[in-house]
């Protein structure tokens, strides 16, 4: 058994143990007078949890993670688990949790000639694993901030923590690899690409370390079609768009639709540092950007507001839900009450092709 499989096996055991408990609760409900859709919170008072059937696969997605600056200061004071203390129950309850790592995890390399360069403590790889993450997207504009060695170090530290790095590798084959994970008889394919890179030198080559590029998307669409033949669900995790803009760029909409047309069931974006619309297109979901997640404070408060996207695959049906959070001192804290209602209303207003309900559920617009 590989290290990744070992971690998924342990996580599956925990999910099954919880699912048998859930089945018992539902059985009691039947005896009381009828089957209900039970929404409860098993681990925290601040978030909605769907108690699921044994054949249902649940996923959680977050936006940008980086552990530098004021975030690093808080980690030094409070430990590596600090950024995830409030959201760990949400991540851990998912069968598969995915995040975008917007930093290198290394102690070496020279800063590249760019405005912002991020280098974080390699111990944060294990902190992410301990918090519930399973896959980590590396195709973005920061994972080579300190050169090729910093990227390879980042991959090494993630793998040591039994996390699966996506969208990067020592060559193009590794960077564009489709990652398949099977849960409860369902095979899910994950692909990770970036449409935002500082230089073509960051693109992986036949014999060159680098990232999976979406600038020429034909190869990406081909990979999606390949994944479609081998998986029950195809997910594209993509870095794209314009910073601090709630409206997607025209190319995002075009590319998102073409990804679905090629076979993607779910497209999840990041890079804008701010939440962008959610959209149902041909029965498939596109979340254009999940914004920041673990990040330094922004002067623009909308950049400090984020959400975990929860997705459930039940048969061939996809259900989706947003769990809002507010980034305070570098740590996402779950929203409640009026703040949560206001945030979800905002996402609903900027999403003309979806309806976001007061409980965070995302459904097609009437």
What does each model-found stretch correspond to?
Residues 2-366:
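Acidic, metal/ion-coordinating pockets
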